[in-house]
Amino acid sequence: MITDTAALQRTIEHREIFHDEMLHLMRRIMSGEMSPVMIAALAVGLRVKKESIGEIAAAATVMREFATPVPVADTEHLVDLCGTGGDAAHTFNISTTAMFVAAAAGARVAKHGGRSVSSTSGSADVLEALGASIDLAPAQVAECLAESGIGFMFAPNHHPAMKHAGPVRKELGVRTIFNILGPLTNPAGAPNQLMGVFHPDLVGIQVRVLQRLGSRHVLVVYGMNGMDEISLSGETLIGELKDGEVREYTVHPSDFGLPVYDTRGLKVASKDESVGCIRRALADEAGPVRDIVLLNAGAALYAADVAPSIGEGVRQAREAVASGAAAKTLERFVATTRRLKGAA
């Protein structure tokens, strides 16, 4: 099997590491057998070479092997809303807000997230600020999903083997393969996904990685203004996997009867500001904050196969917010997590 040094040499020569070799290397990383220096060198080498679909798929396969799973038997309408982060947009937590709307409209949300890496606040940070207990055991996450329609999986609890790469990733401070693996490794095995990415090239790559990994219905999105969400300020590039086939296209807010907004109205400087945006959106306060949530929740409902199109998903999302169902879903989720954790 390939040695660490031979793999590094391969990246220096801009040659691909084959599937079985990548499986071997990633297992060495996840089991603590590879040195921090070599982890860093290999991660940077892959980044400079540009990671291939096969390399990413192999690495994600191993990360899934080492993950602590959430026991969910029924995966119908089970969807994850997450992003790679790293878009430096400093917006409020759009996908986290959208999950309450999507769940209220009939999706079952298995959200995989953590604390802030590049944003003002990560999904874990803002959920805690909303009063939720995020540190649940896998069986408790499954119970929360069954009771509230949402299960939040705090990434460090489900990927303990990532501790070997964590310090290296933090010290490097640049994007590597580890930044794009998280959204590919949902511990509940959600086969449906709305994933935002930080670069347009990743749209075609990530959707094809998920195709190889056996996902059911996926939308990988990149707002052409630089957001890792579906944007309200112009076009969004989408890679869609459905029925085993991949297609790429662009959408515009006007396609769904939504106005175009500047992104400045979505920016926040703190976790508390993000919480304020979430509450305003769920209270049906008109404006860009609510509308970007409706758009992304609509896409999540389409990815979850609850809605037959993004447009119909937006209509269902609008109804869930206007009726108060989305706000009630947030309250129910928070109460359920606190009861399960014993914090109520």
UniProtKB/Swiss-Prot annotation:
Anthranilate 2 binds at R169. It catalyses: N-(5-phospho-beta-D-ribosyl)anthranilate + diphosphate = 5-phospho-alpha-D-ribose 1-diphosphate + anthranilate. Pfam families: Glycos_trans_3N, Glycos_transf_3. 5-phospho-alpha-D-ribose 1-diphosphate binds at residues 83, 86-87, 91, 93-96, 111-119, 123. Pathway: Amino-acid biosynthesis; L-tryptophan biosynthesis; L-tryptophan from chorismate: step 2/5. The keyword Magnesium applies. Its cofactor is Mg(2+). InterPro entries: Anthranilate_Pribosyl_Tfrase, Glycosyl_Trfase_fam3, Glycosyl_Trfase_fam3_N_dom, Glycosyl_Trfase_fam3_N_dom_sf, Nuc_phospho_transferase. Its EC number is 2.4.2.18. Anthranilate 1 binds at G83. It is an enzyme of class 2 (transferase). The keyword Amino-acid biosynthesis applies. Keywords: Amino-acid biosynthesis, Aromatic amino acid biosynthesis, Glycosyltransferase, Magnesium, Metal-binding, Transferase, Tryptophan biosynthesis. Gene3D superfamilies: Nucleoside phosphorylase/phosphoribosyltransferase catalytic domain (3.40.1030.10), Transferase, Pyrimidine Nucleoside Phosphorylase, Chain C (1.20.970.10). Catalyzes the transfer of the phosphoribosyl group of 5-phosphorylribose-1-pyrophosphate (PRPP) to anthranilate to yield N-(5'-phosphoribosyl)-anthranilate (PRA). Homodimer. Belongs to the anthranilate phosphoribosyltransferase family. PANTHER family: ANTHRANILATE PHOSPHORIBOSYLTRANSFERASE (PTHR43285:SF2). This is Anthranilate phosphoribosyltransferase. It comes from Methylibium petroleiphilum (strain ATCC BAA-1232 / LMG 22953 / PM1). The lineage of its organism: Bacteria, Pseudomonadati, Pseudomonadota, Betaproteobacteria, Burkholderiales.
